[in-house]
């Protein structure tokens, strides 16, 4: 009788455990295979599946043209730089004078995250049709009117051309950046002096070779050379040369003219100024390369290893060209092998309702995509080979989706930004 009572209790207990595993993928399948089919269409080298730093995303809406159609935002072409960035007032500048320009700071439309893992973009005051309210109530709001105005000014500066951005950045550079430019100028001057010295040494070597050739012509004329050939052919041992004009016994040097080398102090061995080789080691070496060849060799040495040899793992070049100030609510993400994670180590995925959110430690049951994320060379977040997402209004904020779910959805791109303390 007791056995009959225990069996229903165990059955109910197992049903409770099964229902509590809502976030576990069905049948224990590997959720990392939940990738968009378009991942196969990604062009090699145009998408980066891993980033070595924490980043955020900023909404960049599509532009509505005169015909009522949405056009993709124009991506400004920025030359990537391998240099480390340093924060200076509101501008991020590279640490070398050869930097293509400063990184714009974006504080508007940055994506935030709430406690349950959903990602949102807060609506600004200018997003509403009617304003109002007490200004004192907005003192603690991250998106108050003052911050919005400052963000609008910065966004306006970001829309200017790269040349205007360079001019503006020159007005806000700190004293440390000016000192860095002076150091870079001194370094450039030193490099120019070294190149000048190398050219002078090359000219001296060329002049020395011309003098030697002229001396050879003075002592060895064409008639003497022909006489030597005839005399050597008539002798059984023709390994030694004898001139009619002057014997060559016990002459050590290259041209066989001891007087010439004594006059020019070449009767002794000398050390090479760079490699420490003796003169005899350079007798049959190839001529020294010209300055153009030396520059090409230096450029080849300075090239990354992946450009020298095929199959070598390429050096990392960051595709992120902008930065943003982060707060406690800012969405902070990492990207590793196509998988997004937030600061709580939850998985970035597209759930069954096509909403972009973070769940974990495993994706939500019924999730559509949980992998296949990347960053394009233009610094945009991509899912598969697509950089197009949708922001859909929901009260005082927007949610993000990979497909439009209602009429209040608008296409956007998600620009990746480095997160910094401000």
Swiss-Prot record:
InterPro entries: PIR1-like_C (IPR054508), Yeast_CWMannoprotein_PIR (IPR051153). Residues 158-169 have a biased composition (Polar residues). It holds the Pfam family PIR1-like_C. Residues 1-21 form the signal peptide. Residues 180-189, 198-209 have a biased composition (Low complexity). Disruption phenotype: Leads to increased chitin content in the cell wall, hyperfilamentation, and resistance to sodium dodecyl sulfate, hydrogen peroxide, and sodium chloride. Also shows an increased virulence in a mouse model. Residues 116-143, 155-313 are annotated as: Disordered. The keyword Coiled coil applies. Residues 179-214 form a coiled coil. O-glycosylated. Extensively O-mannosylated. Belongs to the PIR protein family. Probable structural component of the cell wall involved in cell wall integrity and virulence. This is Probable cell wall mannoprotein PIR32. It comes from Candida albicans (strain SC5314 / ATCC MYA-2876) (Yeast).
